[in-house]
Swiss-Prot record:
One of its GO terms (biological process) is tRNA processing. Its EC number is 2.7.7.56. It catalyses: tRNA(n+1) + phosphate = tRNA(n) + a ribonucleoside 5'-diphosphate. It is an enzyme of class 2 (transferase). Phosphorolytic 3'-5' exoribonuclease that plays an important role in tRNA 3'-end maturation. Removes nucleotide residues following the 3'-CCA terminus of tRNAs; can also add nucleotides to the ends of RNA molecules by using nucleoside diphosphates as substrates, but this may not be physiologically important. Probably plays a role in initiation of 16S rRNA degradation (leading to ribosome degradation) during starvation. Disulfide bonds: none annotated. PROSITE patterns: RIBONUCLEASE_PH. This is Ribonuclease PH. The gene is rph. Belongs to the RNase PH family.
């Protein structure tokens, strides 16, 4: 038994909420709040696909991710002012895009592109997992918009998708790390799954001591436990 900084149990998520229709203009818009982490996720739809998909008879989904300058303890420069995106930003937006494309039948989407914009307004660990969880809802809202307009006859959604962080903190596997835990964890892992208990992505790194197979199993089971709860929350938000 350990005392986590947030006083949560090892297998306990931070408080999680989704506010839908958060902004006015996007086809899908969600504010996701995960403890003290807050991310706005917007889904926009345009007709047409990237050049590499021309004549492919399928749609596309892409994602962008960014953090407001004062989303963290001290102000950071906007990446636009530096003239390029950082490696972390590129990695995260690719992860979001891969995760959500796994939820779709892109051929059923047709000649449309969904762009997901994730803007972190307050960061306390887990921004990429929160972004995936909120973006899944925003994407589904955007698909419903196309269905209401009669553009989509068949729903291209195959699965809901959710993500959570797990890690080894003070020698104990824990679920949903906040910043205080993440910055001191011996192992940090992000897990993305579908609502039928299948894995999309597992990213794990040992920061200090290497971890063993039994610890990996414990982390994966913690992630499955957390993702099941997150998907239930997503369903409530979409009902």
């Amino acid at each position: 038994m350990i005392m986590r900084p947030s006083k949560r149990a090892a297998n306990e998520l931070r408080p999680l909420s989704f506010t839908t229709q958060f902004t006015r203009y996007a086809e899908g818009s969600v504010l996701v709040t995960l403890g003290n982490t807050k991310v706005i996720c917007n889904a926009s739809i345009v007709e047409g696909v990237p050049r590499f998909l021309k004549n492919s008879e399928q749609g596309w989904l892409t994602a962008e991710y960014g953090m407001l300058p004062r989303s963290t303890h001290s102000r950071m420069d906007r990446e636009a002012s530096r003239g390029k995106q950082g490696g972390r930003t590129v990695e995260i937006q690719r992860l979001i895009g891969r995760s959500l494309r796994a939820a779709l039948d892109l051929k059923l989407l047709g000649p449309y592109t969904i762009t997901i914009d994730c803007d972190v307004i307050q960061a306390d660990g887990g921004t990429r997992t929160a972004a995936i969880n909120g973006s899944c809802i925003a994407m589904i809202e955007a698909l419903r918009h196309l269905q209401r307009k009669g553009i989509l006859q068949t729903d291209p959604l195959k699965h809901k998708v959710a993500a959570v962080s797990v890690g080894i903190y003070k020698g104990v596997p824990v679920l949903d790390l906040d910043y205080a835990e993440d910055s001191n964890a011996h192992t940090d892992m992000n897990v993305v799954m579908t609502d039928n208990d299948a894995f999309i992505e597992i990213q794990g790194t040992a920061e200090g001591d290497a971890f063993h197979a039994k610890e990996l199993d414990a982390l994966i089971n913690l992630a499955r436990h957390g993702i099941k709860q997150i998907i239930e929350k997503q369903q409530e938000a979409l009902s």
